[in-house]
């Protein structure tokens, strides 16, 4: 029989593995020319349909409370469902999976930065240094450690848009901590999905009007199945259960497995190379995350 800790470790490892796989599938979708906003639209439409029977009773029962908080929930939907997931898939059309997962791995540090800006949490000097170190790491990645690219501002489009995704999720996570909601997490997710889809629908139609139409077939069906079930629903429930078993602080450490899983899968599946600038960027990112989290953990203890 597994202990609580072992069960949590298994669930959290699977969570980060599935989230890393989302980058692999997103890259594969670009190779099969599956439109990024269309993929994200169908991902959340099917997730919404699956969750609907389980959440509708509470939505009806708590409709007044939901309406009272609809502005904040709408922002959560826009930053997570509409922007983050769409931009990740879009970015992978232009950048490497390794670059993407390394940049996304800095999100815990940017959550600290955004939380400080929005006066949600206080920031200490060590966390500020952590943000600076992580930023240096991101600069190494987007510039490929080439001073000429920095001077001429010649960056990969996918790296720049991945920064947008990175900050969008950081804003979402910071705002999520701002308030304790009086509805279940699964119902909150469903309302966030609905709000995000409302703003994603026009973008989906714009993408189609530009000639970016999905080609129905095995690649699309397999891609959609994965993104709905694994990084979408399964990871969400595993993450919640893992936090319940060992706490948010210990669970958060497992997010640092994403660049490891992502890089290994990218090198095996797409034959991507782990370049020297990836190494430099990773060193600064790891240092920034470690500095921020170690100090935060010490204070929380």
Where on the chain are the PLM-derived regions?
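Alpha-helical transmembrane segments of compact multi-pass small-molecule transporters, enriched
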Residues: 46-50, 103-117, 132, 195-199, ...
